[in-house]
A protein has these predicted regions:
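NAD(P)H-binding glycine-rich loop region in Rossmannoid oxidoreductase-like domains
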Residues: 71, 75-146, 150
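Glycine/proline-rich active-site loop of Rossmann-fold NAD(P)-dependent oxidoreductases
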Residues: 169-173, 229-234, 262-269
Length: 279
């Protein structure tokens, strides 16, 4: 990643935003930032991740993408319309696998992330679809545990983790469909060829709730995802709702995620997402 002249000038500007949010006095992440906040992104070449990268780059963030296949990432970013200049100047690629926990820890340590600068982590990786009866070996829980432990080491706070509509936990006392979702995970997900993906998310969420409250986590729970044109209009956009949309466009989820990670009002929440009236 190379910084051009304009980016160097931006990096020495100090932006100030005063005040805190009403949620537990959590200060905005952009307070006194010396450079555009960095986004360390896991799952950047996936259906959602490519759009998270696109909107984060277009919002002037420096994006650090942890990915197995750098060539694939560059290809999908071209496909979704990211300008070559943004890729050249604002994107840094770290090659690695989410199952390699040492590589995951190194990515967090070596990215030089700073809570004071408003830097964040977004985790939107997941197991691919596959017709299977058993869930298989968990992938996300060990990876997120490694990320969380390393965040504590370096003093970083904010992380957004994408799960799914079937993800639930007894602490989600406002979720009236808890038992129904537990049934879906056990019996219906194999028929939908998403057993591995759903079970991975289902195992991860309780860990986040019970072991990560010292961090500023956000857990998103979108419904069925599809590669469709944006459904956002002048009147409606993807946002927090009581129940999830039946189908959510990857592009809309990517745009929401790239913004939501910086929203302190969402810290320690697990929002369902649907198309709601713009505020």
């Amino acid at each position: 990643m190379k910084l051009g002249k304009n980016r160097v000038l931006q990096s020495i500007l100090v932006c100030q935003q005063k005040g805190t949010t009403r949620r537990s006095g959590i200060a905005p992440l952009t307070t006194r930032c010396m450079a555009p906040p960095k986004v360390l992104l896991f799952g950047s070449s996936g259906g959602t991740g490519r759009y998270v990268a696109k909107f984060a780059l277009e919002a002037d963030h420096n994006v650090i993408a942890f990915v197995r296949n750098p060539a694939k990432l560059r290809s999908v970013l071209r496909q979704v319309g990211v300008s070559p200049a943004l890729v050249e100047n604002n994107l840094k690629i770290l090659e690695g696998d989410l199952t390699d926990l040492n590589a995951v820890r190194s990515a967090v340590r070596d990215s030089v992330l700073s809570h004071a600068n408003g830097d964040v982590i977004i985790e939107c990786a997941g197991k691919p679809k596959g017709c299977q009866i058993l869930a298989g070996k968990p992938m996300l829980l060990p990876a997120v545990r490694a990320i969380a432990e390393t965040m504590r080491e370096i003093g970083l706070k904010r992380i957004l983790i994408q799960t799914g509509a079937m993800s639930s936990d007894t602490r989600l006392y406002r979720d009236p469909s808890y038992l129904f979702k537990a049934c879906l995970v056990t019996f219906m997900s194999p028929l939908m060829c998403i057993k591995g993906m759903v079970s991975d998310n289902y195992a991860l969420v309780p860990y986040v709730y019970r072991e990560m409250d010292d961090l500023e986590w956000i857990v998103s729970r979108p419904g069925l995802l599809a590669e469709k044109p944006s459904r956002s209009t002048d009147a409606k956009a993807l946002g927090v709702a009581w129940s999830e949309a039946f189908v959510t466009s990857y592009v809309d989820l990517g745009e929401w995620t790239a913004k939501a990670v910086f929203n302190a009002d969402l810290v320690h929440t697990s929002p369902s997402l649907a198309y709601v009236k713009r505020k």
